[in-house]
């Protein structure tokens, strides 16, 4: 976002909680989604992500036990790299994903149509409205910002900036609609990883083989809809990752946060001492850690070396 001048987009100012040092722990979509959905038990190694299920670690299933109906929406089919099925088999995501029915906004690098984000959000809004007041937990995955996307039915690649602008605008429209609906919603936004719009001495722009800090340092955000916190916004400056997100969701439930118009407890108390996670990132063939203020990388079975910026 900084690379294309969108780090101060108006919608980002509407969020109540901003994780300033959030680590996505990977630079690819599949493991990022698995890490989020399996976040209750902390950060496993890349290999352990694919070692089967532990329902106690799965945030959606933990919420289902409490009576929350599960929903899932995507702006794509979920078929590439067996994405959706891996979330079902490895993270217990139970809802069936409907056929991609949205107006096409982009074409992905593999010719798959990518649906219009606004239409996806509208489908979500209509679905939860039909719940007639029931509680729900929804997982939405969007690939509109993925590298290699083209404008619909065009050969030309779609630059990151107009796609990011459109996504942020659509996110703002979603927030507006939810506020008008009168529903109480905790909206959590966690980017899978950065877009690598700028390269460095190790990787050229758009290359994500190594999960460098420039790629894994992402703006995780939380917006409470249906309450007006008096001390908003607050920033979480400590090193965090997915465990902090699932822990925050737990605190919202434990405190009955939506019980008062201004929130049951101050935001600063809600985020106080959230679990910290040291900056460790992994892909299948690369690991990156921060140690004593410096970043180090390990490729395959080679020795650790300092990451040149």
For the regions a language model picked out, list residue spans one by one:
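Short acidic, glycine/proline-rich loop/turn micro-motifs
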Residues: 41, 149-157, 200-203, 230-234
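Membrane-interface soluble catalytic domains
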Residues: 56-57, 61, 65, 78-82, ...
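Active-site-proximal alpha/beta segments of enzymes that process anionic O-linked groups
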Residues: 1-151, 242, 251-253, 262-265
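Polyampholytic, low-complexity intrinsically disordered segments
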Residues: 144, 162, 172, 286-288
